[in-house]
């Protein structure tokens, strides 16, 4: 008689899922995120862009996205801030609920209450971020600590010791602790992290170009709690928008698009990296960008980090060269001006809500315009502040109306750009065939103020003389009208305050400070590229 087969043992139960990463504080998350990163606000209406979500993946999507699913109007229902368990990078898990595209726009959000602002300002929090050099990232080396970081983030050293040294304990975003030896030595003396630094570099797999962020929060020194975080530099190859160090899987993007198309709730993962556009964008910003009348030739600008000093922001100017009407995500193609900041611009394709059109620059101080004359400040070199009426070259007018002003409502499409929206170059502004004809007694034209290949012609009568003055070491010759006494009569020169130069004014107008050196973490909000 055959024996019945033995019962097979049931398969072992699957291992429990790993515990979710611990939540991190909002200020810590913003400090470790790329500059200009933002945290979406629960309850607001946003546009979700799957193509931007796909840029968070290390490889392209297996299938192209349907053309009907370019973006989805949604409401944010939850935002969870965490740190990656492998890399330590901050990321946000955003829960979204799709809306109909004809849903009415929400009312403007109320201003934060005074109590909320006071509570945010009262939090004791500072951080310092430094991009790693090749020496910092070398295995077996040390970390050169900027003095500002050592003085304001680390506890004070006893400079009477020889050498001054201390042990620092720092926690990371994953809850682990790290021990570093902080010493002040060398010729000239400098602050260094030695013992413990190589272990940290190897564990975090840091390379040159990544950024380390030192933070303290809570009570003042010596009871303050020290934290350390990292920012990962993106790795792009060629024209690909995919980041080789991306952490989002393509399947997550495809699943989010499927659920959004079915009007079902879904979640997305957002890593705030430099160069990756936000793909969950406030609706009001998208609506404004899509309703702007963009056209080729427009001058635009975007706020970016300086390439040589990531603690500072700069306005990067460019010219709109192409409109890709078949899509919404990165529909604008911009040719960026050559500048120090342009090296931080990784993609010439941008979104309409990431840039601003550049209108007429403001009138400079001291410039006077009347019906039949123009008087302008003396210019330095080839940089000149000019009024809008001179922005657009006009055909030579008939002889009977020479000297009249001709306005053009679309002149700003041809404004040359430079590091600041209000500064233009006379070589570009005044072509060879441009004649500016005005009464000879009403304008001062310094010979040293106009390049020789770009003349500004001012006819002189036989009775006119020449008057020279010396300003900041430059001899300036101006036409004047003689009188019976031979005295200087009608030439008008706008005076420059003593001790002021153009370089200072240009620097103040073009740059604003980015809080990567020492900040309380409250000014990270803003669009980024």
From Swiss-Prot:
A single cellular component GO annotation: nucleus
Q: Which organism is it from?
A: Oryza sativa subsp. japonica (Rice)
The UniProt annotation gives the DNA-binding region as 128-234
Quote the biased-composition stretches of kind Acidic residues, using this chain's numbering.
499-510
Question: Which SMART domains does the entry link to?
Answer: B3 (SM01019)
Record's function text: Auxin response factors (ARFs) are transcriptional factors that bind specifically to the DNA sequence 5'-TGTCTC-3' found in the auxin-responsive promoter elements (AuxREs).
Protein's GO biological process: auxin-activated signaling pathway; regulation of DNA-templated transcription
Tissue expression as described in the entry: Expressed in roots, culms, leaves and young panicles.
Sorted keywords for this record are: Auxin signaling pathway, DNA-binding, Nucleus, Transcription, Transcription regulation
Q: What is its main location?
A: nucleus
Name the domain of life. Answer: Eukaryota
| Protein name per UniProt | Auxin response factor 13
Into which family does the record put it? Belongs to the ARF family.
Q: Give the Gene Ontology MF terms in alphabetical order.
A: DNA binding
Region of interest (Disordered), ranges: 1-22, 443-462, 497-529
């Amino acid at each position: 008689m055959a024996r019945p087969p033995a019962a097979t043992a049931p398969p072992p139960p699957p291992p429990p899922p790993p515990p979710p990463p611990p939540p991190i504080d909002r200020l810590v998350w913003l400090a470790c995120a790329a500059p200009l990163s933002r945290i979406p606000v629960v309850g607001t209406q946003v546009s979700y862009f799957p193509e931007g979500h796909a840029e968070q993946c290390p490889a392209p999507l297996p299938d192209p996205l349907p053309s009907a699913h370019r973006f989805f109007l949604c409401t944010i229902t939850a935002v969870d801030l965490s740190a990656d368990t492998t890399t330590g990078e901050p990321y946000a898990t955003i829960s979204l609920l799709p809306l109909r595209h004809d849903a009415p726009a929400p009312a403007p959000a109320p201003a934060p209450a005074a109590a909320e602002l006071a509570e945010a300002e009262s939090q004791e929090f500072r951080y310092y971020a430094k991009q790693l050099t090749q020496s910092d990232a070398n295995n077996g080396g040390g970390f050169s600590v900027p003095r500002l970081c050592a003085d304001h983030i680390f506890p004070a050293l006893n400079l009477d010791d020889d050498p001054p040294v201390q042990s620092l304990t720092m926690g990371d975003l994953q809850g682990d602790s790290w021990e570093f030896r902080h010493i002040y030595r060398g010729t000239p003396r400098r602050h260094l992290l030695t013992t413990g630094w190589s272990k940290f570099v190897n564990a975090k797999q840091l390379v040159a170009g990544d950024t380390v962020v030192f933070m303290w929060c809570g009570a003042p020194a010596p009871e303050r709690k020290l934290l350390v975080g990292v920012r990962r530099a993106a790795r792009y190859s060629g024209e690909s928008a995919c980041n080789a160090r991306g952490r989002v899987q393509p399947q997550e993007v495809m699943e989010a698009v499927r659920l959004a198309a079915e009007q079902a709730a879904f979640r997305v993962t957002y890593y705030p990296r430099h160069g990756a556009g936000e793909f969950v964008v406030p609706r009001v910003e998208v609506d404004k960008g899509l309703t702007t009348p963009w056209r080729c030739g427009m001058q635009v600008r975007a706020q970016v980090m300086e390439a040589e000093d990531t603690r500072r922001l700069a306005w990067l100017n460019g010219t709109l060269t192409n409109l890709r009407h078949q899509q919404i995500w990165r529909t604008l193609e911009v040719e960026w001006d050559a500048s120090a900041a342009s090296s931080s611009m990784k993609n010439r394709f941008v979104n309409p809500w990431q840039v601003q059109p550049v209108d007429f620059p403001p009138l400079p101080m001291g410039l006077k315009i009347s019906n039949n004359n123009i008087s302008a400040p003396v210019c330095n070199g080839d940089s000149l502040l000019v009024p809008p009426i001179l922005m657009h070259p006009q055909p030579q007018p008939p002889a009977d109306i020479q000297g009249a002003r001709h306005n053009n409502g679309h002149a700003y499409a041809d404004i040359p750009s430079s590091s600041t929206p209000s500064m233009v170059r006379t070589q570009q502004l005044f072509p060879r065939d441009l004649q500016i004809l005005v009464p000879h007694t009403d304008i001062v034209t310094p010979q040293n103020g106009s390049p020789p290949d770009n003349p500004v012609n001012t006819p002189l009568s036989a009775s006119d003389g020449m008057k020279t003055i010396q300003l900041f070491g430059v001899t300036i010759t101006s036409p004047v009208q003689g009188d019976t006494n031979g005295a200087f009569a009608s030439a008008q020169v706008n005076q420059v305050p003593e001790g002021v130069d153009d370089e200072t004014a240009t620097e103040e107008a073009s740059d604003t400070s980015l809080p990567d050196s020492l900040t309380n973490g409250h000014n990270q909000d803003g669009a980024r590229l």
